């Protein structure tokens, strides 16, 4: 890879020597998967770090979404956002449910609670919001609506690792939250994911479902799948957990630099930190007003690429624009004006712990010039 290339993200890696030492222990034990000691330890350490009661590890970030819907026995219609990675909606479809899109709040990029009630029908059983870019949803407003109509709430928290509101982990909201530990995330286990739940009964059910439905050596209690995390990635995750706070702080410093440099650039806007929130700086999206900036989003995107700077248009196109979902009534662009506006103007700038001062300045100069 070109050494001068500035990538949009870069994986947080544990020391190779430290990881090799743990691998040797795993080799000696000959226990490489199926709820081994590293798996148990990582679940325990993550629950403490995230300030949640229970964590169940998965082999990637999509399977927790699929399994959460199964665990809560969701049927019918699920209200969700079109402004996310497509796995959010795929999980609904794979469970035989119908996704119903509602528009977003332009101040956050998250599902607009004011749009939810109008989308509820007698077939609605759940709401699946996303903490977009790690910015917390209005969890109280969403929960009030869910309680009023007897709906379950499953948060796709793929971007929200370690995010807190007034000192409380955001993953305590709703009935279940799911996480992605993909290599591109703030915290990664190479590939991986997790589910957060609030009681031991649900934890047991989910652990059964991710292990083919086995509740014992000879008893299957439901149609489960195999989505367990192995010992190697669990060990990797334990090591990465020790350095994730430093990585988040490094990201914070990048965000400070971007904001200071870009705040006065006409036609470029971005999100500021929310009061009382411990952010994780998963992404740094900017929004391009072509008329004011003098260049379209796609022109700036191409300019960055020509200079060896890889941004990403997260999330363009909207999920509702993919052929699989375009025919849904709720996918009508007239129903989703704010989501379309954001999708058509966004570029996520390079954001990771490994960016040098020179890298950051190159990104800034490309936008300011």
Feature-to-residue mapping (PLM):
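PLP-dependent aminotransferase-like
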Residues: 1, 70-157, 164
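N-terminal "arm"/small-domain region of PLP-dependent enzymes with the aminotransferase-like
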Residues: 1-32, 350
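Phosphate-binding glycine-rich loop
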Residues: 31, 35-77, 83, 91-94, ...
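PLP-dependent aminotransferase class I/II
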Residues: 37-45, 49-53, 114, 118, ...
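Structural detector of well-ordered beta-strand residues that form the stable sheet scaffold
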Residues: 56, 79, 100, 153-154, ...
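Histidine-centered beta-alpha loop that forms part of the nucleotide-sugar donor binding/catalytic region
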Residues: 83, 97, 104, 158-159, ...
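Conserved active-site segment immediately N-terminal to the catalytic lysine
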Residues: 155-189, 204, 216-221
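Short beta-strand-to-turn element immediately C-terminal to the catalytic PLP-Schiff-base lysine
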Residues: 180, 193-199, 238
